[in-house]
C-alpha cells in the first residue's frame, strides 16, 4: 500500500525553513532524484506535519528526574553482572568522543566497563582524550590499532577486550541514556536466564539540542527482524553467545550488526525487549541515521544477511528490496494449499463491504480462502438484506458480535471460529 500525505495535513513551513542549510537542501535534492517528486512530497509531509503528540515535550517530560537517577545509583541488585560496552572508534570528532564516554560515566548502574578500539593511530586529539579518560577512570580502557581494519574487525578487537558477562554495542558518536544499564539489569532480576536484550531508541541532532523520531519497538519478532533491523540499538548480549556466534564478519560490512544480531538471536534462548528509550542515535552528515543513501552498499549487505540467516535456519524464502531503504520482503514458498481466513468486522456498511468482497474475488488468484464477516450491532434493513444475499456463498460465514465495538476483541473472536 503506497503512502499518502494525511488529508488536510499542513507542513510547518516556519519549522522547515529554520532547518534549511546547504546540507539539508542537497539531501532533499538527492532524495527527490532517487525517489521522484511524489515520494519527496510525502516525506516532506511526514517530517514537517504537526505531530499529534509532539515528541520533544513528551521526551522532556518522560526522562527520569535527577532525584530518580540518584535513587537508582543507590539501588543494590541481587544480580549485578559486569556489562562491557564495546566501541570501535575511527576518526571520531573529539567532542562526540567525549560525549559518548561521559554518557557511560554518568550511568546509574556502576558495574560496567568501556572498551574502545581506536583505529585512528595518527589522530593525536583522539589519543589525548582516550588517555585522559583512561587515566581518570579504571573502567575506561582503550586499545590503539596500527591501522584501520574496517568496522567488523575493529569491533571484534573491542569484543576481545571485554571481560563482562554481557556485551553491549555502542557507536562512537552516539549516547546512552543515564539509566540505560540500570534498566537492563533491572529486567534481568526477573529474567536472569535471558541471553540478549534490546531497548527502544530515538535520534538526536548533532548539537544534542533536539530529540526526534522515537523508535518504540515490539517484543522479539523474528518475522519483523527479517524485514528490517528493528532491534538495531541498544543491543546487549551474553559474551558466551558472542563467542558462539563468532563476532562480526567483514563480508557484511555496512550491515555487520544486522548479520550479528541474526546469529546471536539464533543461538540465544530468551531475547528480551526493554521498553524504554535508552539509546540516542546522533545524526550528522555522514550518519546513516540522517542520510541512509550515504551508505547504499549497506542495504545490499542487509539483504545478504537475511539470506544467510534463512540458509542457516533451513528456511526457504526469496529476499528482495523494497522502495524504502533498509526494509526487505521475504517471500516464502506456499506449502500445500492451506485455508486462508479473511476477517471483516462490519456495522451497517453495505457498499463498503460489497466493494471489499468484489475486490477480493477479482484480485485474489489463490482460491482456498474463506471470508468471516463479523456483524456488530447493525441497524439498517439494507445490510441485513445483503447478508441474506450472501448466505448462498459457501466461502462466506457470518458471525454476530453483540457487544460494543472493540477491534481486537472482534478479530480474536473471529479467529477462534476460523
Feature names for model-found ranges:
Residues 33-105, 307-362:
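N-proximal low-complexity "stem/linker" segments adjacent to membrane-targeting elements
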Residues 105-147, 361-400:
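Acidic donor-binding segment of Leloir-type glycosyltransferases
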Residues 145-162, 183, 401-418:
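Glycine-rich, basic loop-to-helix element that forms the pyrophosphate-binding segment
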Residues 152, 160, 204, 210-240, ...:
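A recurrent flexible, glycine/aromatic-enriched loop bordering the glycosyltransferase active site
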Residues 167:
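Short aromatic/hydrophobic "clamp" motif used to bind/position activated sugar donors
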Residues 175, 179-212, 284:
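Conserved donor NDP-sugar-binding/catalytic core segment of glycosyltransferases
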Residues 246-262, 297:
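Donor nucleotide-sugar recognition loop
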Residues 250-252, 262-281, 286, 304-322:
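Catalytic donor-sugar/metal-binding loop of nucleotide-sugar-dependent glycosyltransferases
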Amino acid at each position: 500500500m503506497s503512502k499518502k500525505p494525511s488529508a488536510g495535513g499542513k507542513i510547518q513551513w516556519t519549522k522547515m525553513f529554520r532547518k534549511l542549510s546547504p546540507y539539508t537542501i542537497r539531501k532533499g535534492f538527492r532524495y527527490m532524484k532517487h525517489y521522484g517528486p511524489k515520494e519527496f512530497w510525502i516525506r516532506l509531509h511526514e517530517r514537517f506535519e504537526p505531530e499529534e503528540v509532539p515528541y520533544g515535550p513528551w521526551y522532556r517530560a518522560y526522562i527520569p528526574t535527577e532525584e530518580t537517577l540518584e535513587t537508582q545509583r543507590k539501588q543494590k541488585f541481587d544480580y549485578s553482572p559486569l556489562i562491557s560496552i564495546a566501541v570501535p572508534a575511527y576518526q571520531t570528532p573529539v567532542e562526540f568522543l567525549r560525549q559518548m564516554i561521559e554518557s557511560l560515566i554518568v550511568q546509574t548502574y556502576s558495574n560496567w566497563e568501556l572498551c574502545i578500539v581506536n583505529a585512528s593511530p595518527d589522530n593525536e586529539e583522539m589519543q589525548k582524550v582516550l588517555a585522559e579518560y583512561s587515566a581518570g577512570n579504571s573502567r575506561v580502557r582503550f586499545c590503539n590499532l596500527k591501522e584501520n581494519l574496517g568496522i567488523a574487525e575493529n569491533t571484534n578487537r573491542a569484543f576481545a577486550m571485554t571481560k563482562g558477562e554481557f556485551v553491549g554495542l555502542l557507536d562512537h558518536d552516539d549516547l546512552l541514556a543515564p539509566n540505560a544499564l540500570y534498566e537492563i539489569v533491572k529486567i534481568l532480576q526477573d529474567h536472569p536466564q535471558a541471553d540478549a536484550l534490546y531497548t527502544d531508541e530515538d535520534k538526536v541532532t548533532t548539537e544534542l539540542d533536539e530529540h526526534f523520531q522515537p523508535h518504540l519497538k515490539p517484543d522479539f519478532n523474528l518475522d519483523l527482524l527479517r524485514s528490517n533491523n528493528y532491534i538495531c540499538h541498544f543491543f546487549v548480549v551474553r559474551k558466551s553467545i558472542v563467542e558462539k556466534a563468532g563476532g562480526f564478519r567483514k563480508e557484511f560490512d555496512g550491515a555487520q550488526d544486522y548479520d550479528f544480531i541474526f546469529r546471536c538471536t539464533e543461538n540465544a534462548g530468551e531475547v528480551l525487549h526493554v521498553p524504554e528509550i535508552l539509546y540516542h542515535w546522533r545524526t550528522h552528515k555522514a550518519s546513516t541515521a540522517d542520510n541512509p543513501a550515504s551508505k547504499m552498499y549497506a542495504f545490499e549487505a542487509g539483504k545478504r544477511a537475511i539470506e544467510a540467516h534463512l540458509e542457516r535456519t533451513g528456511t526457504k524464502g526469496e529476499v528482495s528490496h523494497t522502495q524504502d531503504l533498509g526494509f526487505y520482503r521475504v517471500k516464502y514458498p506456499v506449502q500445500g494449499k492451506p485455508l486462508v481466513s479473511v476477517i471483516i468486522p462490519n456495522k451497517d456498511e453495505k457498499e463498503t463491504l460489497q466493494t471489499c468482497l468484489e475486490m477480493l474475488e477479482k484480485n485474489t488468484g489463490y482460491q482456498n480462502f474463506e471470508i468471516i464477516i463479523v456483524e456488530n450491532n447493525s441497524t439498517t434493513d439494507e445490510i441485513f438484506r445483503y447478508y441474506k444475499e450472501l448466505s448462498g456463498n459457501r466461502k462466506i460465514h457470518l458471525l454476530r458480535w453483540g457487544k460494543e465495538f472493540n477491534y481486537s476483541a472482534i478479530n480474536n473472536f473471529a479467529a477462534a471460529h476460523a
